[in-house]
Amino acid sequence: MRRVAVVRFPGSNCDADTLRAAEAAGCDAYYVWHRATDLAQADVVILPGGFSYGDYLRSGAIARFSPVMGAVVAHAQAGGPVLGICNGFQILCEAGLLPGGLMRNAGLRFLSRPVWVRVETADTPFTHLYTPGETLELPIAHGDGRYVAEPRVAADLEARGQVVLRYVRENPNGSLHDIAGVANAGRNVVGIMPHPERRVALVLGGADGARIFQSMEARNATHQTGDVRVGRDQHLRV
C-alpha cells in the first residue's frame, strides 16, 4: 500500500476530496501541513487544488516558499512521484519542478465546468492505467489556467513526450498547444489543471479521473508500467 501525502496550504480546498480519492484507490493517504519539513514517510506527494495563500501576488507564488516545499523538491529530485492538481500545478511551476507557467485565462474569467482532455502519454506514475489517445471528461475550476512557455521549452515538451493531457473539442483558457498537463523530463513530476478527484465515481457524474489515483497504487503492486489495466467502466467506491 502506497503512502500518499496530501499537502495542505492555507487556502487549499480540494485536499479532502483528493485524500478520499487516494484512499478509495487503496492508498494510505494522510495530510501534511505546509509547515512540515519531512516527507520521508511518503511514497507519493500530491499538491491539491485551491487558492493557496489567497492567490496573492500570483497563483502558487507564495506557496512555493512554504517550508514543506523543500521536502517536496527533495522527494522529486530523488525520483519520488509528485502530482500537482490545479493550484498544485501552479505551485510546481513556481517551484521550478515543472517547465512553463500558468497565467490568467484568455477570457479573463474564472471557469468552472467539465471539459474534454486527451491522454497524450501513459508513461507517468499517474497515467499508466490509461491508453494514449483516450479522451476523458474532467472538471476544471480556475482563473489562472492558461499554460504558457517559451517556444523552445514548448517544442522540447512536444518532442520529448512530456505533454500529459491536452484539451480537445475546445481550448477553454487559451493554453499554449491546448496543454492541460505536463510532466518533467523524468516523468515523476506531473501537473494537471483538471480535477480528477471530482470524477472518481458515477455518483459524481463520471469516473474518468479514478485511474489517476489507481495508477499510483497499481504501480506500487507491479513496479512496471502496463502490467495492470483497469477497465474504462470501473470506478472508485465513495
What are these regions (language model features)?
Residues M1-I85, C93-P99, M103-N105, F110-L111, ...:
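N-terminal beta1-alpha1 cap of cysteine-dependent amidohydrolase-like domains
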Residues M1-R2, G133-T135, N184-V189:
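Beta-strand-turn-beta hairpins that frame and shape the catalytic cleft
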Residues A5-V6, E137-A141, V190-P194:
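Active-site-proximal beta-strand elements of phosphoester/diester hydrolases
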Residues A25, A78-G79, A159-G161, A185:
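Structured helix-beta-strand junction loops
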Residues G50-F51, G88, G143, P196:
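Active-site metal-binding loops of divalent metal-dependent hydrolases
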Residues L97-D178:
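Pocket-forming structural segment of enzyme catalytic cores
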Residues I179-L204:
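A glycine-centered loop/beta-turn motif at secondary-structure junctions
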